[in-house]
Amino acid sequence: MYVDLLDRAEFGVFFEHFVFLELRAFLDYFEPRSEIGLWRTQKGEFEVDFVVGRRLGIEVKAAGRVTPRHLDGLRKLREEGIVAKLVVVSCEPHCRHLEEENIRIYPWRNFISELWSRRGWLWE
């Protein structure tokens, strides 16, 4: 029996792992001393999937449309002043920049492309 992975509840975990592997490969190749970690509030109410040094906070969402609720962890991270840029990697079809919050929403292909090219907003 064929089952489409996009229809599985586990797809979000697979998707987050895929983004992690790309980040880890990139950092190992270009910035071997850079650290990647998870950020979470003291009580665990909010978290951000990946924090790359003091440069980048990344939330990964397998959703086809990122909603305001998906941004809660990034908003809290911004309040802490830990990173310079905030990003959501998603399954959305187009890039968006939420200017009022200075958060970029990337389709995963665009994010991976910009990451490896070392050009674009991520690198400004």
Residue positions per predicted region:
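A cross-kingdom feature that marks ATP-driven nucleic-acid transaction machinery
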Residues: 1-124
